[in-house]
């Protein structure tokens, strides 16, 4: 795309160089050529030339008005002032319609066919779509045609020339955009902090749970070991009675024997 725009930029520079040494009818003819030239869609540098501005004082003031219209205006503006402006050639008319599409695209991302037909003063949908396709091929807009819903969906459009009086509004818009970006950034930072805090809390809780599980396992293991020892001891006591209980009958027998002996 950049490669396609370079020849147009060079062409505009050539027109500007030619215009610097031109005046009168030669200058108006040059302006007409610029307005017809393929790929040339910005005219601010040409408008800033002193000899071009001098046209406002003479009989060719209408050409300066027409150049201003191509720089900042739209096709409806031309129709509204048609009586005081030079007649457009077919190429100039198509270019001004292209610029009108760009102006609409800068305000709306989905442009209804009905709006385009009205502003471009067209009745035939096929001709409208052909005009849009021409604008796409010249790289002044990018988008697609939604024929089912009769919309032009815009992805990109070039910037048009800017009036000096509009600069303050542009600066204000940029400041508002920057403020909006800062607000979004602050919101993201707060979400990151919350996410990190949640992660930290979750990690701490997980560690506590793991520690409790480990303690419970140790307790269960110790309890199981103690129970096993008690059971073994009980079994051992049942199988092998204490020696003290086995010796008691022997003592009794000894006493009996003593009594028997004393009687004899």
UniProtKB/Swiss-Prot annotation:
It comes from Bos taurus. The keyword Cell cycle does not apply. Residues 194-237 form a coiled coil. Belongs to the CSN7/EIF3M family. CSN7 subfamily. It comes from the Eukaryota. Component of the COP9 signalosome complex (CSN), a complex involved in various cellular and developmental processes. The CSN complex is an essential regulator of the ubiquitin (Ubl) conjugation pathway by mediating the deneddylation of the cullin subunits of SCF-type E3 ligase complexes, leading to decrease the Ubl ligase activity of SCF-type complexes such as SCF, CSA or DDB2. The complex is also involved in phosphorylation of p53/TP53, JUN, I-kappa-B-alpha/NFKBIA, ITPK1 and IRF8/ICSBP, possibly via its association with CK2 and PKD kinases. The keyword Hydrolase does not apply. Residues 223-264 are annotated as: Disordered. This is COP9 signalosome complex subunit 7b.
């Amino acid at each position: 795309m950049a490669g396609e725009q370079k020849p147009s930029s060079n062409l505009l520079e050539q027109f500007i160089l030619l215009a610097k040494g031109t005046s009168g009818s030669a200058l108006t003819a040059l302006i007409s050529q610029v307005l017809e030239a393929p790929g040339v869609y910005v005219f601010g540098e040409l408008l800033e030339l002193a000899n071009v501005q001098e046209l406002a004082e003479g009989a060719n003031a209408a050409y300066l008005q027409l150049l201003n219209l191509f720089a900042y205006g739209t096709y409806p503006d031309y129709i509204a002032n048609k009586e005081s402006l030079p007649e457009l050639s077919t190429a100039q008319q198509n270019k001004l319609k292209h610029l009108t599409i760009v102006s609409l695209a800068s305000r709306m991302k989905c442009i209804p066919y009905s709006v385009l037909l009205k502003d471009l003063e067209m009745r035939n949908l096929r001709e409208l779509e052909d005009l849009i396709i021409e604008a796409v091929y010249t790289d002044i807009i990018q988008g697609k045609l939604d024929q089912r819903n009769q919309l032009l969906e815009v992805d990109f459009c070039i910037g048009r020339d800017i009036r000096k009086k509009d600069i303050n509004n542009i600066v204000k818009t940029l400041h508002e955009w920057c403020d909006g970006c800062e607000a979004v950034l602050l919101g993201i930072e707060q979400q990151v902090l919350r996410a990190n805090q949640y992660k930290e809390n979750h990690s701490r809780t997980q560690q506590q749970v793991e520690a409790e599980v480990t303690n419970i396992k140790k307790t269960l293991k110790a309890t199981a070991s103690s129970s096993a020892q008690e059971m073994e001891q009980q079994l051992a006591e049942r199988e092998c009675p204490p020696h003290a209980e086995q010796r008691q009958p022997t003592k009794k027998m000894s006493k009996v024997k003593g009594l028997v002996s004393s009687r004899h």
